[in-house]
């Protein structure tokens, strides 16, 4: 019995050493240590041995089985390490090869213009105020001197959700909200960028969703001359140092007096061209002095405080600046269009 155990050990260790992969090694494990293997058979046949030999043969059988098990584990670890090394060799990276170029995106032209305008006014000391796109009727209309029954409240012009809730039609509600937070104490100096919504038919110059940037300054002794100086500086920074502006009388419910603001044409220098339609001037925004009713509803004493407000459409400015003839290009995600602005 002893000789058989020693021979089994020798054969098992020899086959373990010859195994070239994990499958072959597992076959050796099953052959020698499995339920039907020779080691198990020896242990089962110990009942036929004389009582005095059983302890010796049992101890030897366990010793042989332990030696085979240790050899299997050592060989398995070696084969697994060799497999890892083969995979690493096959997947080796040549660090001297040139990298694959990564296609980078670029800011959307509309985003570019909005950020440029924001940076310009932040440089003048303004802060950016943002608010909800789903707005109450009060802040969208009443707080801005648009009482019940005003044409701007027509269901055909605005996206109403309920009688008192709608998608904001301008970013002016943030002006009213900000003035309320100041509790009648100036100064207030903000710009309000964001998306707005109106019931409009989409075409080359109109969209049911577009962006606005509005500005507001409230303090003691604010005059129309302050408004003009601010907008002249804005026009020169955005369209070039040689630009001038002009005011034309207009009407907005929340400002009095109100003006339309034109900038001298940056394409023809005022001589007349297709961009300015031969006039030498391009309309870019609306503005005016904050209506006393708006100040009073926000908690400001209109006899002590005055202010000016202005509003512009970044889409129009981007169209003028980049020569874009259709507002729908901004929203159609056409890569052929967007790639034109990689180096603008």
From Swiss-Prot:
It catalyses: tRNA(Phe) + L-phenylalanine + ATP = L-phenylalanyl-tRNA(Phe) + AMP + diphosphate + H(+). PROSITE patterns: AA_TRNA_LIGASE_II. Binds 2 magnesium ions per tetramer. Its main location: cytoplasm. It is found in: Cytoplasm. It comes from the Bacteria. GO terms for cellular component: cytoplasm. Keywords: Aminoacyl-tRNA synthetase, ATP-binding, Cytoplasm, Ligase, Magnesium, Metal-binding, Nucleotide-binding, Protein biosynthesis. PANTHER family: PHENYLALANINE--TRNA LIGASE, MITOCHONDRIAL (PTHR11538:SF41), PHENYLALANYL-TRNA SYNTHETASE (PTHR11538). This is Phenylalanine--tRNA ligase alpha subunit. It comes from Geobacillus kaustophilus (strain HTA426). The gene is pheS.
């Amino acid at each position: 019995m002893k000789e058989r155990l020693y021979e089994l050990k020798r054969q098992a260790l020899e086959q373990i050493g010859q195994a070239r992969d994990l499958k072959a090694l597992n076959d050796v494990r099953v052959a020698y240590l499995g339920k039907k293997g020779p080691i198990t058979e020896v242990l089962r046949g110990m009942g036929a041995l004389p009582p005095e030999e059983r302890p010796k043969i049992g101890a030897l059988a366990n010793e042989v089985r332990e030696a085979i098990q240790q050899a299997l584990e050592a060989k398995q670890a070696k084969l697994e390490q060799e497999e890892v090394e083969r995979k690493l060799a096959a997947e080796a990276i040549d660090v001297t090869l040139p990298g694959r170029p990564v296609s980078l995106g670029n800011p959307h032209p509309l985003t570019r213009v909005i950020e440029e305008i924001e940076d310009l006014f932040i440089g003048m000391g303004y802060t950016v105020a943002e608010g909800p796109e789903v707005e109450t009727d009060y802040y969208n209309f009443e707080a801005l001197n648009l009482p019940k029954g005003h044409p701007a409240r027509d269901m055909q012009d605005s996206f109403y959700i309920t009688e008192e809730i709608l998608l904001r039609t301008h970013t002016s509600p943030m002006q009213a909200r900000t003035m309320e937070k100041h509790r009648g104490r100036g100064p207030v100096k903000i710009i309000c960028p964001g998306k707005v919504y109106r019931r409009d038919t989409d075409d080359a110059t109109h969209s049911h969703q577009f962006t606005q940037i509005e500005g507001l300054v409230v303090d003691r002794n604010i005059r129309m001359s302050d408004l003009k100086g601010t907008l002249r500086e804005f026009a020169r920074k955005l369209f070039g140092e040689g630009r001038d502006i002009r005011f034309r009388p207009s009407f907005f419910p929340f400002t009095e007096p109100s003006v339309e603001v034109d900038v001298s044409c940056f394409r023809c220098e005022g001589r007349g061209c297709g961009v300015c339609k031969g006039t030498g001037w391009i309309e870019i925004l609306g503005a005016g002095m904050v209506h006393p009713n708006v100040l009073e509803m926000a908690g400001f004493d209109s006899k002590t405080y005055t202010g000016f407000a202005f509003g512009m459409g970044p889409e129009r400015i981007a169209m003028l600046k980049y020569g874009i003839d259709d507002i729908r290009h901004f929203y159609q995600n056409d890569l052929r269009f967007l790639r034109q602005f990689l180096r603008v």
